[in-house]
Structure formats: structure tokens, C-alpha cells
Design a protein with these regions (language model features):
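A conserved structural/catalytic subdomain of Rossmann-like adenosyl-cofactor enzymes
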Residues: 1-168
Length: 168
């Protein structure tokens, strides 16, 4: 089923109960996070939830969570969503990973058991353990210092008082 991502986050007790009810009757095979522009102009963040209907979800079932936001389609002004040269290869890679023909890095696919309380999205399960490049690190430090300076200039320096450390 193609649904908004908010349908699989399950933040409220009612949403968690719905997800629990679904798992009692159906097996979640996986969720594919789609490009935010898949339904260009609608303003929803879509995903595809794949179920095996009529079979209760086993507690130890490993589900696939795939980040397919980079699907090879781009928005063009006045034309909408257009296929790029990479679209076919990316779709084939998605299918190869889904059907277990190739392994994928965890930044593309995470396989794990789930519970109704979990967010059923790749971003919930993915942990980026890559070391940042020097450029990325310097940018992050620069962004933080800019933020801190801005807060101090707005009279909110107290937010940082307990976190000051002396650099020798």
C-alpha cells in the first residue's frame, strides 16, 4: 500500500493499537521510503508498506526498511516529475535488494525485527556510523558556533553557560 509516512510512525496510543491490530492479522515484509516529490504538488511524504495478507506477523520476522528517496526522478519547473538517466538503474537496484539478489549498505536497506511501537521507517532503524569528512566536521562546528553567537546576540547566552569548557 502507498501511504503517508505518518501512517507508520505510530506516535499516539491509538496509532500503536492500529499497528498492533494489523500485525495480528498480516505480516509486514518491509517499508520503502519514497522521494518526497513522488506525488509532486500534493505535499505528502509517501512510503510503500508491503504486507503478506492473512498471515499473522511472527515476532522474530526480519523486515526490510529501504531508503528510496534518491529514486532517479527530479522535479522540473512547469513540467513536474521527470525521469533521469539513473532512474532505471536505481529501480533495478531496489528490486535486487528487495528480492535478496544483492546486499546493500545500511544507508540504503536495514533489515530488522519490529514491534508495533516502532516507527516503521528506514530513518528509525538506520544509524550512520560513517566518520564525517574534515569539510563536514568543520561545517558542523561552524554552524554550531554561528547558532551560539546568534543566541548570545539575542540575549540567550544563558543557554550555553553550563556547557562552557576551557580549551587549553
Amino acid at each position: 500500500v502507498i501511504i503517508p509516512q505518518s501512517s507508520v510512525t505510530g506516535k499516539s496510543n491509538e496509532e500503536r493499537a492500529i499497528k498492533k491490530s494489523i500485525l495480528k492479522k498480516h505480516t509486514l515484509e518491509g517499508v520503502i521510503t519514497l522521494n518526497k516529490d513522488t506525488f509532486y504538488g500534493v505535499g505528502t511524504m509517501p512510503c510503500i508498506a508491503v504486507f503478506t495478507a492473512g498471515e499473522p506477523h511472527p515476532s522474530n520476522k526480519e523486515c526490510k526498511f529501504i531508503d528510496f528517496r534518491e529514486d532517479g526522478y527530479k522535479v522540473s519547473a512547469h513540467k513536474g516529475l521527470l525521469e533521469t538517466e539513473q532512474a532505471k538503474d536505481r529501480k533495478q537496484h531496489l528490486l535486487d535488494v528487495w528480492f535478496g539478489r544483492v546486499n546493500a549498505e545500511s544507508k540504503f536497506c536495514v533489515k530488522t525485527a519490529i514491534e508495533a511501537e516502532d516507527e516503521w521507517l528506514h530513518a528509525f532503524f538506520y544509524f550512520n556510523d560513517e566518520l564525517p569528512t574534515d569539510v563536514e566536521f568543520e561545517k558542523t562546528i561552524g554552524d554550531f558556533l554561528t547558532f551560539e553567537f546568534s543566541m548570545i546576540m539575542q540575549g540567550r547566552g544563558y543557554l550555553f553557560e553550563s556547557h562552557k569548557t576551557e580549551i587549553i
